[in-house]
Amino acid sequence: MADEVSAYAAYGKTLPKKQAPKRRQAKRWPKKTTKQTPKTLAKRTAKRASGDKANGQNNGAAAKRQNGVQTKPKAQKLGTHDNASADARRIDSISGSIHCNGVNSNNNNNNSSSSSMPSKKNKGRRSDVSDTEQSESLDDTVNLARKMADYLSECGEQNCGSDADSSGSSYGEYDSSDNDDNMSGESGSASESESCSEDYDKSSGSDSDNECGDGDSDVDCDSDVDCDSDSEGGSAWGSESDDQFSEEYTLNSHANSSSNNNSSNNNSSSNNSNSSASSPEASVMPAAGRRKATKRSEHLASNSDGSDFIDSNNNNKNKNTPPAAKQQKLQVQQRLKQKQLEKQEKRANAAVQRENAAPFCPLQRTATTAAKSCPLPSKEAAGAKPGRKSCPLPSKSAPAANKMAPNKMAAKMCALPPKNERAAQQQRKRAERDEQRQEAKGRRSENELLPEGKQRQQVHLQDSIEEGKRMLHWLINPMTSDDFFSQYWERNACQVKRKQPNYFSQLISFKLIDEMLIRNHLEFTTNIDVTTYKNGMRETHNPDGRAMPPTVWGFYSDGCSIRILNPSTYLIKVRQLCAMMQEFFHCLVGANVYLTPPNSQGFAPHYDDIEAFVLQVEGRKRWRLYSPLHPSDVLARNSSGNYSQAELGEPLFDAVLEPGDILYFPRGTVHQAVCDQQQHSLHITLSVYQQQAYANLLEELMPAVLQRAIKHHLSLRRGLPLHIWQHLGLAKGDQKSELRDELLGNTKRLVQQYLMPSDAQIDAAVDQLAKRFQHEALPPVVLPEEHERTVFGSRSQANSHGQCLCDYELTERTSVRLLRANILRLVAEGSSLRVYYYVDNALEFCKYEANFMEIQPTEAAAVEALMSAYPKYLKVAKLPLRSAERRIEVATALWERGLLMTEQPFK
């Protein structure tokens, strides 16, 4: 029959043909198919053939597979010569399951493309049918296929609505009542599901069919919730690309919910040919390809429709969803849609904000790191806390409240500060600029030319003594150091007033004190004193233990004065100032910090044994100075007790120190200070020249002179006259006799003759004072230029054999010098020579024993040469030692202890 059209061709005429992309093979969850061997097929064919003969040689099998659903035989079997009523019943049975809700597939993936199309199983089973019967059956099949196509097109128009892209081609679930097999295709890329008519072309490109392996379990991916686990080859449902599709589908799915639910009650579902016919744009494909593509697209449409797959445990009997469950699913769908709309609007808001950023907030910042110049919107607009000043992102509730607003209005602009706020900002900026100018001026005065007009050299070429003198000049400028020492040093008090409040602010501040208390372990009495002076009585309120900030500030709030005894241990700027000045003064330069609350006084009137420099850092304080009460108190060697106001006369000096001012007064000067009624006071007292008088030298000198005279002169070792007690003493002081005069004369002659110190003895006494300085001094603050030229910048490492490799090597061509002018002292201790040094001292006062190294007498000349050459560099070859090896050894030993610095860095 040449003009007869096959069922395959009939479907091809109805649907346009499209080229399907190749499918990727899934790496996980492979489909489990039952491979039927020829032997198995032969057995089944023989069995069914015998059954057909027993039933009267019917044209159809005892149990037919229509649309992928195995149905039981009817009482009146339908053959190839049935009339039109049989065709109508067949169409009704097929159309009853086609309501765009499901997809049919059997366990073996052998779905028939049409109930009338001959399958592979029927080929060997119907060998007894004649050619005439086959041609007539083919005619019936063609007619039936055409009727089915017409019916399906009407079904698509009635049930699926006009929007075929979003909801018109959602298919039914796969149902097999005999095997209870539920096979569901997992969703692929969401962007591929925009049109059900392109299910095959788009879904076949992703290998995302996830089947139940054993036929009795199913993988159910509900569209109401997000599936976290995606099948391989497909993307997760609910991705950003399907936002528009899901929105349209959700709006259209409510209109078709009744028809979809009714179609899901049928026990048979549509086959691949029917599903293709329901979509006019679907392309014709082989049966196997259509089965896979249909399962894939139908599951995606089923997910988008919000309907769940039927659980295999209920045997597919309870397919009618209760009204409460439907309502719950609709609510979940609405929430899902709302979330998707919020995401879209947030993206649009972010894009508009980036395009239309406010001038004061060029970058999007979080609330914690936002620019302070951009205040928050009002509380009603943004719902944010009013305390912070920042430019926040739009609140999460804003998109939900303004979902219908255009995207260009979604982003919030950072409002400009009000006029009064801008004025305050300008005032703060001016104050900051003034502070910066004053600090720069202070730095210029600190880094200006030396008083003698000498230009400062590079750091590694500077003289530490001159640097200490420069620091003194920074304290007292515009006064010169020469005028200061000639007019005021150890004579009169001196005040230098400045109109620079931030002149000393880099040294210490209220904030630095608080940080110091938190970061370091300071103890009361050892590091901090808490004092008050009320009604002529000074009291100390030191508790035990560590000085924690709450405790210290609690005392301060109660009107107590806080004294920090060793701030140079914890504050680097104060330490650097003291370390540089001690090189110039050749003695320890200490520092105390006094923090006094308003309208209070912490200490009673007294005098000290130090030369005092008072640096007013913050606030105001009134100072009054008095003359020493006794002549012996002038330049006192020890501090006094507390005086009462009645013991003091009229003050010699009465003035108020303001921030940036400095006050100097000699040791032995009685002083007291009281805070202003409205302002607190923070000042630093630098103490200089403590126990640095001639008396201290003689205390070191005379015992040594006497001991040496006794050792070398016999006259000092002779015994006293027997009658000396009868002529000398307190009771005999008023008597006049020759024996008394003789005894007094002999004693004076011995002192004048044998106790006159020699130059060497005076040198030794000075060395002892210098030795004390080496023990008390602060360690040097090594600058970066010095760091790379000293041992402090050296780094050693090991080679592959575990041997240590040093990154330095001194030779005779290496030029070296001392790190500081007073970094070491050569002292004779008995029969040995020692080199004392302070480079390894602790930051606390005399925490450790003095550091020293013993050298051979022949090596002393090398140390002396280095001390004499300072601040110039000296080549190792010029050290006065006999051999080059010994010169290198001595220089290396001093360099490794941090006492020497090379002219050129090793690295």
UniProtKB/Swiss-Prot annotation:
Keywords annotated in UniProt: Chromatin regulator, Dioxygenase, Iron, Metal-binding, Nucleus, Oxidoreductase, Phosphoprotein, Repressor, Transcription, Transcription regulation
Molecular function as annotated in GO: 2-oxoglutarate-dependent dioxygenase activity; histone H3K36 demethylase activity; histone H3K36me/H3K36me2 demethylase activity; histone H3K4me/H3K4me2/H3K4me3 demethylase activity; iron ion binding
Binding locations of Fe cation: H606, D608, H671
Broad class of the protein's primary localization: nucleus
Compositionally biased intervals (Acidic residues): 130-139, 208-231
Biased composition (Basic residues): 15-34
The keyword Glycosyltransferase belongs to this UniProt entry's keyword annotation: no
Name the UniProt record assigns to this protein: Bifunctional lysine-specific demethylase and histidyl-hydroxylase NO66
Organism: Drosophila virilis
